[in-house]
Amino acid sequence: MLEYAEKQCLPVSIHSRNSLSDVIEIVKEYDIKNVLFHWFDGDVNHIKQIIDNNYYVSFGPVLLYSKRIIKTVNHIPLNLILVETDGPLNYSNCFKSVLSSPFLLPSIIFRLSYIKHKSFHIVCEKIFSNTIKYVNHSF
């Protein structure tokens, strides 16, 4: 899959739960312009590699309640962040068993704007711009 993405100049979205260090090393072997670590669950130790390689990371509703993820987000530049919901999943931690869907995106962006000390409007524009760059990089 990575070889095909490299040859076709396609972006890739990678779910690397519990294997992030290994996956980063594998991805670095390819010349793929846009890599997204979807549902990023890495820590501060992984962030340097993410930043050095201009990889994107995305965060979902876990950003609303996970202190570890909030701490991690503080170290990632806004220009490398995307948001998502990856549903349907049940988030009993903060939404009383509501299934995730795009209606949660404004809450995620609001939380991100609070963490980054930026206006909601600025963060929305940046997330939109990041998304366009990620998807259209090869065009």
Question: Language-model segments: what does each one mean?
Answer:
Residues 4, 103-139:
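Mid-to-C-terminal alpha-helical segments outside catalytic/metal-binding sites
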Residues 56-70:
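Active-site glycine- and acidic-residue-rich loops that bind
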Residues 13, 36, 58-59, 82:
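Conserved beta-strand positions in the central sheet of alpha/beta enzyme cores
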Residues 79-98:
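Short acidic/histidine-rich active-site segments
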Residues 1-53, 71, 96, 100, ...:
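Divalent metal-binding pocket/active-site signature
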Residues 16, 39, 61-62, 87:
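Active-site metal-binding loops of divalent metal-dependent hydrolases
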Residues 46, 68-69, 108, 127:
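Hydrophobic alpha-helical segments typical of transmembrane helices
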Residues 68-78:
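Short amphipathic alpha-helices and their capping/turn segments at secondary-structure boundaries
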